[in-house]
Amino acid sequence: MGKKIISLAMFLALFLLFLNDPAAPQVYRYKDKNGVVHFTDTPPDDKFTRVQNERFRSTQFPYYGNNLLIEMASNRLELVSQAVVGVKTNSTRGTAFLINPLGHAITNYHVIAEAGGDIQAVTFDGQEWNAWVISTDPDKDLALIQIGGGKYPYLPLGKLTDASIGKEVYIVGNPLGLSHSMSRGIVSSVRKGMNKNTPLTLIQTDAAINAGNSGGPLITPEGLVLGVVTFKAGTPNLPVQGIGFAVSSEDIISGLSLTPAKESPGPNSSKQ
């Protein structure tokens, strides 16, 4: 065991050294005028890069806040991560995602149910903000919270028709405290049911779900939210892999009031 720990430590040290080495090789991906994708260690010319950046920033994904983060984001999925926040209470850890620039975010009810008014949200840039509950739907395990601070990046909600069987999907969250981690899978099934006489639609996926993912978004490659990650199947005596569920985006819309006109009153301070 000791040798394994030492080997892992050496690997991580070398990996971090490589990341911080200015001489480490860079790989660029670009598309030529014929639509052919190329990979090269030589950066494309400035004119091409400028056009590509303008096209990328004109996509439907809305963004507000630190422009530096826009420059750092290399693809749409990285931008998606910037609209995901960690949620901390006295007793739980989970995830939430922003749905408008005012700081309104969706999470699971069970993540904030016992918070007692003490909720902290950790944004992509590492800042910690006070947050408070706006509305809840316990039967659908949903909650709308308000995060203090300025304008935020946010995610658009998709439709249930976007959740076709076999479609590639991603989960962004804070599994085991590893902030803004992403896992990948497919839509395995779409299941309709009832919870305490409340209609509920669950999207089944084989993307990895672990403690801390609760409340995070299940998203398409285009950055549309298909659902809110809620739970994974399993029992203490029967380990189960690759069966997780997210409450559908349609349940988000029907279960919570998502159109507050103004910023809600409450604490508005960073606890960086």
Model region roles, listed by residue range:
Residues 31-36, 55-98, 255-272:
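N-terminal activation segment of mature serine protease catalytic domains
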Residues 81-173, 177-180, 199, 262-265:
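Conserved active-site neighborhood of the chymotrypsin/trypsin-like protease fold
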Residues 28, 38, 106, 226-227:
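Generic structural signal for well-ordered beta-strand positions
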Residues 9-17:
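Bacterial N-terminal signal peptides
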